[in-house]
Amino acid sequence: MNMQEDKSIIEVSHVSKFFGDKTALDDVTLNVKKGEFVTILGPSGCGKTTLLRLIAGFQTASEGEIRISGKEITQTPPHKRPVNTVFQKYALFPHLNVYDNIAFGLKLKKTPKQTIGKKVKAALKMVGMTDYEYRDVDSLSGGQQQRVAIARAIVNEPEVLLLDEPLAALDLKMRKDMQMELKEMHKSLGITFVYVTHDQEEALTLSDTIVVMSEGKIQQIGTPIDIYNEPINSFVADFIGESNILNGTMIHDKLVRFCGTEFECVDEGFGENTPVDVVIRPEDLYIFPVSEMAQLTGVVQTSIFKGVHYEMTVLCGGYEFLVQDYHHFEVGAEVGLLVKPFDIHIMKKERVCNTFEGKLQDATHVEFLGCTFECASVEGLESGTDVKVEVDFDKVILQDNEEDGTLTGEVKFILYKGDHYHLTVWSDWDENVFVDTNDVWDDGDRVGITIPPDAIRVIKITD
């Protein structure tokens, strides 16, 4: 039985971690309740493993505080923390058999031999390895070795079990089987699991609570259902499952416009004529032969059988929708689409344009992003004045040849918005530049960045 309590067993308060001039974690605060199965989810490089290693004690926070069971342990070494860690690479001792691998920690604690025997057998039973205690670990499959690693961790009866992508090296079927076993194990043990993964489906399957991370920050914390159905921003919507994410305008409460059409929705409190992001899951779109019911009409561009459903792309007046349905429509078929009000999810836009801090050089030049840009003539401000600089997303120009740009950067995040791509480009000045483009770029592409003079708005900073 999972004995969940309101009391937090892990408290991470305003924790940051720096490696030189790079920020791995940026002011992270997280509370984990006793008995919870919490998954820290995010792409490679988001900071999830760094956070786990800080909780485990393998690294030390640059700023902030970590408590376990109310005790401050930020500087406490790993062996003195009430946690055990299971890694992707099982880290078993090849010269020891299964029994001795599991018993190793107990022997270090000078636990009585009879007690060790009972605990090892109980741990082996928990992971379904009762008949394997005297086998060499090299003779075991990957899944069996991972079970031994988990048994070695739980035999010490930690208050918290930390799992760093423990199933990543397993094949798909074995991974699915182990997911179910981990979930049952968590229920039986009743201890707190903190699990790190980049696999969205794994997180949705296993977790009581999901913590979504990106660029060293927590983006959203919630139940799997909340995270999936009510993503807080476009990153979460795109990263968790598949989504149609579109630019829209909230006309007023419960009425939104996107794709040139007005739709009823259930969202309120966004104000009138407010730019928003609209999220519709592919399975929430109804597709059928064109009829009066259709809110949008379009043509099927692709259709792929996925085993349980068909996945189709439908082009509606220049906007591309991803649709999942049990019914098959041939490529080229004219179809209607319909979405119900409660299946339209509205998100406040994180930003409506690029905003930078700058300094006016003279009437036609402004410095920002570490470079001097030509701009339209600025009246009424003296040279050297600190200013705010705004640039619309679609006015930023990216070049294949880095040397052609005023500055350079790397494409870090790509979001398809139905009729264009919204890119996050990490500039070499260590600031994000956001770009709307019809050109196809890949994550990791090095690019030149150019901003035309007439695209730069220089605004006086007011107190």
Swiss-Prot record:
SUPFAM superfamilies: MOP-like, P-loop containing nucleoside triphosphate hydrolases
Topology of the protein relative to the lipid bilayer: Peripheral membrane protein
Catalyzed chemical reaction(s): ATP + H2O + polyamine-[polyamine-binding protein]Side 1 = ADP + phosphate + polyamineSide 2 + [polyamine-binding protein]Side 1
MF terms (GO), sorted A to Z: ABC-type putrescine transporter activity; ATP binding; ATP hydrolysis activity
GO cellular component labels: ATP-binding cassette (ABC) transporter complex
Pfam families: ABC_tran (PF00005), TOBE_2 (PF08402)
Entry annotated with the keyword Chaperone: no
Stretches assigned to coiled coil: none
InterPro entries: AAA+_ATPase, ABC_SmlMolc_Importer, ABC_transporter-like_ATP-bd, ABC_transporter-like_CS, Mo/tungstate-bd_C_term_dom, P-loop_NTPase, PotA-like, PotA_ATP-bd
EC number from the UniProt entry: 7.6.2.11
Binding site for ATP: 42-49
Enzyme class: translocase
Keyword Membrane: yes
Cellular localization per UniProt: Cell inner membrane
Record's keyword terms, sorted: ATP-binding, Cell inner membrane, Cell membrane, Membrane, Nucleotide-binding, Translocase, Transport
Domain ABC transporter positions: 10-240
Protein family according to the UniProt entry: Belongs to the ABC transporter superfamily. Spermidine/putrescine importer (TC 3.A.1.11.1) family.
NCBIfam families: potA (TIGR01187)
The protein's assembly and partners: The complex is composed of two ATP-binding proteins (PotA), two transmembrane proteins (PotB and PotC) and a solute-binding protein (PotD).
The protein's role, per its UniProt record: Part of the ABC transporter complex PotABCD involved in spermidine/putrescine import. Responsible for energy coupling to the transport system.
Protein name stated in the entry: Spermidine/putrescine import ATP-binding protein PotA
Lineage: Bacteria, Pseudomonadati, Bacteroidota, Bacteroidia, Bacteroidales
